[in-house]
Amino acid sequence: LECNKLVPIAHKTCPEGKNLCYKMFMVSTSTVPVKRGCIDVCPKDSALVKYVCCNTDRCN
């Protein structure tokens, strides 16, 4: 699986076991992602951050 990094033109191949792509947003500014990459389990939302996940190449 390949996931985008924070800069959309950059991407990386995910390591074994991390087979979801994610975008992380601050809850207060939920339109601008602050982090992108590979993740193993989703979602991991909290009071401050929100994750949006998907499982196809570079879908984040």
From Swiss-Prot:
Its main location: secreted. Transmembrane segments: none annotated. Expressed by the venom gland. One of its GO terms (cellular component) is membrane. GO terms for biological process: killing of cells of another organism. The keyword Membrane applies. It comes from the Eukaryota. GO terms for molecular function: toxin activity. PROSITE patterns: SNAKE_TOXIN. Keywords: Cardiotoxin, Cytolysis, Disulfide bond, Membrane, Secreted, Target cell membrane, Target membrane, Toxin. SUPFAM superfamilies: Snake toxin-like (SSF57302). This is Cytotoxin 9. Monomer in solution; Homodimer and oligomer in the presence of negatively charged lipids forming a pore with a size ranging between 20 and 30 Angstroms. Disulfide bonds join 3-21, 14-38, 42-53, 54-59. Belongs to the three-finger toxin family. Short-chain subfamily. Type IA cytotoxin sub-subfamily.
